[in-house]
Each structure stands twice: as C-alpha cells, then as structure tokens.
Amino acid sequence: MMKTTIMFMLVVVISLTYSSEEQEVARTYCGAHLANTLADLCFGVEKRSGAQYAPYFWTRQYLGSRGKRGVVDECCFRPCTLDVLLSYCG
C-alpha cells in the first residue's frame, strides 16, 4: 500500500513538472527589453524576399485586426508569448 502511494505521488509530481515546462508564459515586453528580446529571438532568422510577400490587396483583406496592430500593441500593452514575438522576425 505504501509503495503504491509513493509511486502515485511520484507520477503526479513528474507529470506536473513536465506539463508546466511545456506551457509558455505570456509576458509584457516594453522599451529596451522588447528590442533586446526581439534582437535575440530574430538573430539568424532569414529575411523574407519580396516574392514571399502577398500582394497588397490580399494582405489588407485577410490580415484583419492584427494587420493594424504592431508588436508594441501586442506585447507591451498586454502580455504575449515568445511565439507571437517570433512572428515579427524577418
């Protein structure tokens, strides 16, 4: 009985630790902290060529509200994840 309880507790602790490592925390990034984080994340990310950009009329039609906001709106005025910051690279 005691071994089963210990084993169960061990499994619970390991699963909680593993799941918390996978969750990405949303944070606010402003000013120099935002600039430095973007520089670190985007270092080595290749810039997109002009051919990879969609035509202007297509982007305006399908970007929706995100096309009107910038990285400061998304990551300084409210928390964002590193994945959102990475979307601004290139």
UniProtKB/Swiss-Prot annotation:
<feature type="disulfide bond" description="Interchain (between B and A chains)">
    <location>
        <begin position="30"/>
        <end position="76"/>
    </location>
</feature>
<dbReference type="InterPro" id="IPR036438">
    <property type="entry name" value="Insulin-like_sf"/>
</dbReference>
<dbReference type="InterPro" id="IPR017097">
    <property type="entry name" value="Bombyxin"/>
</dbReference>
<keyword id="KW-0165">Cleavage on pair of basic residues</keyword>
<dbReference type="InterPro" id="IPR022352">
    <property type="entry name" value="Insulin_family"/>
</dbReference>
<feature type="propeptide" description="C peptide like">
    <location>
        <begin position="49"/>
        <end position="67"/>
    </location>
</feature>
<dbReference type="GO" id="GO:0008083">
    <property type="term" value="F:growth factor activity"/>
</dbReference>
<keyword id="KW-1015">Disulfide bond</keyword>
<dbReference type="Pfam" id="PF00049">
    <property type="entry name" value="Insulin"/>
</dbReference>
<dbReference type="GO" id="GO:0005615">
    <property type="term" value="C:extracellular space"/>
</dbReference>
<keyword id="KW-0372">Hormone</keyword>
<dbReference type="GO" id="GO:0005179">
    <property type="term" value="F:hormone activity"/>
</dbReference>
<feature type="signal peptide">
    <location>
        <begin position="1"/>
        <end position="20"/>
    </location>
</feature>
<feature type="disulfide bond">
    <location>
        <begin position="75"/>
        <end position="80"/>
    </location>
</feature>
<keyword id="KW-0964">Secreted</keyword>
<comment type="similarity">
    <text>Belongs to the insulin family.</text>
</comment>
<dbReference type="InterPro" id="IPR027285">
    <property type="entry name" value="Bombyxin_B"/>
</dbReference>
<dbReference type="InterPro" id="IPR016179">
    <property type="entry name" value="Insulin-like"/>
</dbReference>
<comment type="function">
    <text>Brain peptide responsible for activation of prothoracic glands to produce ecdysone in insects.</text>
</comment>
<protein>
    <recommendedName>
        <fullName>Bombyxin B-3</fullName>
    </recommendedName>
</protein>
<comment type="subunit">
    <text>Heterodimer of a B chain and an A chain linked by two disulfide bonds.</text>
</comment>
<feature type="disulfide bond" description="Interchain (between B and A chains)">
    <location>
        <begin position="42"/>
        <end position="89"/>
    </location>
</feature>
<keyword id="KW-0732">Signal</keyword>
<dbReference type="InterPro" id="IPR022353">
    <property type="entry name" value="Insulin_CS"/>
</dbReference>
